Each structure stands twice: as C-alpha cells, then as structure tokens.
Amino acid sequence: MNTYRTAIIGYGRMAHGHAKAYQEVGLPLVAVADISEEALARFRDQFGQRQMYTDYRQMLDEVHPDIISVVTHDQLHCPMVVDAAERGVKGIVCEKPMAMTLKEADRMLTACRLSGTQLTISHQRYYTPQYAQARELLSSGAVGAVRSAEAYLLPSCIHTDGTHTIHMLLSLLSNPRVLHLLAQVDGHSGHVYYGHRVEDAGVAFIAFEQGIHAHLNWGLASHQPRTPLHPSPDFRYHGFIIHGETGRLELDGDGPVGDRPILRIVRGTEIEAVNLRPGKSSIRLEIEDLVSSIETGAPHPLSGQNGRDVLEVIIGIYESARRRRVIQFPFEVKENPFLAMCEAGDFPS
C-alpha cells in the first residue's frame, strides 16, 4: 500500500474515530482544521502536534493532503467535498448523511467525477460483524427468498441518524430498486439537530422491485415523557426483521437486548443464534477500502453514488409527507422538503 497523507476537517465527537483509524491503517495524519481553537487543542492533547488550521481551505491549499475526512455538520458536507475535489484530493471520507438535498449530492458527485476523486459516505455500520453476517445469511438463502422487511430507529430522525437505517435496509435487501413509497412525518416540536430542524417521528412504506416491500418506523411519540413511536422497541438504535419464504432474520442493531442473541434466524418456534466473528474498527475498514479504490479504481462499497441512493429515499419520504401522496421513483426534487414544510409553517406546535 502506498503512503497517503491525510487530514481531517472538523474535529468533533466522530472525528476522533477517523483520526484513530488513520493511525491504525498506518497513514500519516498531517493536519486538522476546525473553526474552534478548543477543538484543535483537544486534538493536540489526544494525538499530538500537527499542522492546525481554523480555515479548511487554507489547510487544503497549504498541506495538499491525499485523503481527507469531512466530519462536520450536514449543511457543510457539499461545499467542503467540492472544495477538496477541486483541489485534487484523491480520496474523501464524508460523514453521513451525504448532503441536505439531492442537488447538493449531484454537485458533489460531479466534482469528484471531474477530478477523479474517490468519495465515500461513512455508513460505516456496513462493516460491523452483525450487519455483515446478516447480509451474508440473506444472500445465501438462510430464510429463503426475501418477501418483506421491518426497520426501526429510536429515537432520532430519518435524515441524520436514519440514513444508517435506510442504508442498512437497502444493503440487507441487496440494494433493490425502489419503485415507490408513501410516508408521513411529525415535526411539531421544532427540534434542532446538528444545526437544522429535524422531525420527531415518522412512518414509511417502501415498495421495491421483485415484489419486496418494507415498513419503517422511527422517532418519539412524545418528548416529555420520552415515549417511542413503536410500542416495544426491543433493539439498540436500529432494529431489523427480514421476512423470507422459510423464516425470518432478526437483528437487534448496535448491541444485544438482555440475554437475547443480537442476530438470529427464526423458523416457526425454533430460534437459531448466530455467533458473530470478531471485527475490526469499521472506519478503519472503510479507509482501507478507500485506499484500494484509489489504487485500483474499483468502486467503494460506500461510494458517493451509494450515498446518493440512500439520500434519495430520505428525500422521497419527506416529499411524500409534504405532498401527501405516493412518490414514484425516480423523481425530481432538488430542495429539502422537510425544511420547506418547516418554513411554510406546516408543523404547528
């Protein structure tokens, strides 16, 4: 593996994992940029002195990193990715969600295509053992042909955290083409998350090719007291049930619930626990695949186009809620329908 000089834009909570992963892969981390001097001092305390910047463009112009991580609020992903691509960065790890709108996502993809930059969107749970083995089991026919799926998210919104839920649902189903969806969201509380308004709860029905359909359920029925929309959320952060012809696969998300196996196959009254393999850091594996994509040109499992596909489902959910109708795929919506609904006063408190 060649040596690539790396840098990080935005040093918040998630950025520590990126910095550690670069060290584990053996790539020199040469610079970090953040508008907060306090954040830069925290990085220095954790990883030692590097080139420090409060202006990310200045860092890109002076350091010329080969690979960067964009670990900032959602609204900043597009301009930062475009600026890096236009300056010749070879690889970009962009935190999820990809962007605020499909227009921004398309701008990012175009900039990276023109510069030859490999872009990956950090849906890193793709690499964790329970999700990787769940994909393998479904692909091998462990429950027969897949017919339907249930996906759950607690407590957050479909855009900022549910992007993981959508991504994992699509990957568990082998990325089928979306035909149409119908959805509704509740945004009455005015909750702000990572710098922008988000919904409190929502539901969606998605129809895929090959006759597969999925139901999504996320968020809170109330904040005080905190009451989940789903009456019995026995999962950790995300939860999935995949129904097949001969059984179902159940996945409890990011951690076990009580003594129950986190991943299991259910056939009638029989429950088969799946033993999980040891796993490496998911961000480390994402970066290793990015290096491989840079050197071989092979598509990354978490490519920018894959990230756009996930964002299209999210925007479709918001557009269905705004228009109160079924949304056929593909569609042309360049704004963020949820934010448009907020600006129009569609969510009275």
Give the predicted meaning of each segment.
Residues 1-47, 169:
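N-terminal Rossmann-like dinucleotide-binding module
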Residues 194, 210-286, 303:
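NAD(P)-dinucleotide binding in Rossmann-like oxidoreductases
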Residues 62, 66-67, 73, 78-126:
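Beta-strand-loop-alpha-helix segment that lines the small-molecule cofactor/substrate pocket
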Residues 147-237, 243, 305:
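Rossmann-like dinucleotide-binding domain that binds NAD(P)(H)
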Residues 128-148:
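Rossmann-like NAD(P)H-binding beta-loop-alpha module
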Residues 49-56:
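Conserved SAM-binding strand-loop segment of SAM-dependent methyltransferases
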Residues 31, 51, 67, 91, ...:
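Short, Asp-centered acidic motifs that coordinate Mg2+ and/or phosphate
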Residues 1, 27, 67-70, 106, ...:
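C-terminal helix-rich "cap/oligomerization" subdomain common to oxidoreductases
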